[in-house]
Design a protein with these regions (language model features):
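Charged, low-complexity intrinsically disordered terminal segments
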Residues: 319-329
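Extended, charged low-complexity segments
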Residues: 330-373
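A surface-exposed partner-binding patch
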Residues: 2-268, 283-297, 303-321, 373
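Flexible glycine-rich active-site/ligand-binding loops centered on an Asp-His dyad
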Residues: 273-281
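Carbohydrate-interacting/catalytic domains
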Residues: 261-264, 278, 359-362
C-alpha cells in the first residue's frame, strides 16, 4: 500500500496499536461515536473508522473518492475537523480513514474535509475526500453493492409525443415518493391557470419536491405578475437571476401557452417547448439536480457526449433553457441533462434514484468530478 500518512502502515489490516501510533499515543487520545463511526482524536492526528456497508443516512464510505460522517458531533470532533476560531487550527492535522469488516479493520488512507454543515455550532454532516481514490475492488469490499431494486420506469416516455399530461403524471409519481405527503390528494378546483400548472400543483400536494429544489415553481399563492404587470411569474431561479412566466390576460388561459424565460433587465425569450413540454423538462432537470446519487463528468466534447449517452434514451423534446440549450436522456432510475453554450464544449449532469442506476455510466472513459456508483 502506498504510504499516504506521516506514519507508514505496512499492511492493509491494522489494529488498535496502529491507531495509537497514528494519533500520538493512547493516554491522551479521546474517543467518540458519531453516526455509527468511531473517531479517535490524539495530539498528532485523527483516525475515523466507519462500518462497512451502504447506508445513505449513516456514516460510511460513499464512493471511491468520498467518506461521509453523519452527526451530531461533539465539540472536540467539530473543532478537529473544522478548526476553532479561538485556538490553534487543528483542521490541518491528518485524518486517517479505516473501515470495520467484522473483527478486523482495513486502513483506506488519508482524507481531507471537503464540505461540512453545522447547526448552532454543532457539526451535523461532514464529507471527506480521499487523497488517493479507492480501487473498484476495494470499494466493493468496504461498500458492498446494494441489492437490486425496482427502479422508476420509462412508461412515461412513450407519452411525451402524445399525452404530455399523462407523461408528467407518470414521471412524477414514479420518481418521487408520497411518503412525506402532508395533504390528502385533491382534484383540481376551477382556476384561471392553464391545465398544466393545475396538474403540477395537484401532484405536488402529495409530492412537494415536484415543485423543485434547485430552481422552483412558485406555490399557487405565490404567483404574481412581473414589474410591468404583463406576465404571470410562476417559476424562479434559486438565486433570483431569472424567472419563467406566462402572458397574463383577463381572458381564460390558453390550453398550452408559451413559456417565457427572462432575466430581470433583459427582453424575454420564449422557451422552445410550450408549457406541457416545459413542465416535463423542468421536472427532469429538478429530479437530476436533487438526486441522492450523482455522476458528474468534466467538460465533454461532442464525441464524448455521444458515447456518454449511447446507452440512454433521448427525451423527444426541443432544447430546454435558452441560456445553454439542454437535452435530456434517461434510463430506468436515471436522468441525464447535457447542455452547451457554444456547441463545442458540453456539460453533463446525471442524477439517479438508486446507486445501481448509475451502472450504464460506470465504465465510460471520462474524467469524473464525482461518481457515486
Amino acid at each position: 500500500m502506498t504510504d499516504q500518512g506521516s506514519v507508514a502502515i505496512s499492511a492493509l489490516v491494522f489494529d488498535e496499536e496502529h491507531v495509537s501510533v497514528l494519533v500520538g499515543g493512547p493516554v491522551s487520545a479521546e474517543r467518540f461515536m458519531v453516526g455509527g463511526a468511531s473517531i479517535v482524536i490524539g495530539p498528532a492526528e485523527t483516525v475515523i473508522t466507519v462500518e462497512a456497508g451502504d447506508s445513505p443516512a449513516g456514516s460510511g464510505v460513499w464512493s471511491a473518492e468520498e467518506v461521509r460522517l453523519t452527526g451530531p458531533a461533539p465539540a472536540s470532533v467539530t473543532e478537529r475537523l473544522m478548526g476553532s476560531p479561538w485556538a490553534a487550527d487543528e483542521s490541518s492535522l491528518q485524518i486517517h480513514i479505516a473501515v470495520r469488516l467484522g473483527e478486523q479493520a482495513l486502513y483506506l488512507g488519508t482524507a481531507k474535509v471537503s464540505r461540512a454543515r453545522t447547526s448552532d455550532g454543532v457539526l451535523t454532516n461532514c464529507e471527506l475526500r480521499f487523497e488517493a481514490p479507492l480501487s473498484r475492488q476495494l470499494l466493493n469490499r468496504v461498500r458492498p453493492p446494494l441489492p437490486a431494486v425496482d427502479l422508476p420506469g420509462l412508461e412515461w416516455l412513450r407519452n411525451v409525443k402524445g399525452d404530455r399530461a399523462a407523461a408528467l403524471d407518470q414521471f412524477i409519481t414514479g420518481w418521487y415518493s408520497d411518503a412525506d405527503a402532508t395533504e390528502p390528494p385533491a382534484t383540481c378546483s376551477p382556476s384561471c391557470l392553464p391545465a398544466g400548472l393545475r396538474q403540477l400543483y395537484r401532484l405536488a400536494r402529495q409530492r412537494p419536491s415536484a415543485l423543485g429544489t434547485q430552481n422552483s415553481i412558485l406555490p399557487e399563492p405565490g404567483l404574481h405578475t412581473d414589474h410591468l404587470g404583463e406576465m404571470l411569474v410562476f417559476g424562479v431561479e434559486n438565486q433570483g437571476g431569472f424567472f419563467w412566466s406566462l402572458l397574463w390576460t383577463l381572458d381564460g388561459p390558453e390550453a398550452d401557452p408559451t413559456v417565457w424565460f427572462r432575466e430581470f433587465d433583459e427582453e424575454p425569450i420564449a422557451e422552445q417547448e410550450p408549457l406541457s413540454g416545459f413542465l416535463i423538462q423542468f421536472s427532469l432537470f429538478e429530479a437530476s439536480m436533487s438526486a441522492d446519487y450523482l455522476a458528474l463528468p468534466r467538460t465533454l466534447t461532442a464525441a464524448q457526449v455521444a458515447r456518454f449517452t449511447e446507452a440512454l434514451h433521448l427525451v423527444p423534446l426541443r432544447p430546454f433553457w435558452p441560456w445553454a440549450p439542454t437535452h435530456f436522456y434517461v434510463a430506468p432510475g436515471l436522468v441525464v441533462h447535457v447542455s452547451s453554450e457554444d456547441g463545442e464544449k458540453f456539460d453533463a449532469w446525471a442524477g439517479a434514484s438508486h446507486r445501481s442506476a448509475l451502472a450504464p455510466l460506470a465504465d465510460l472513459p471520462v474524467d469524473w468530478i464525482r461518481f457515486d456508483g
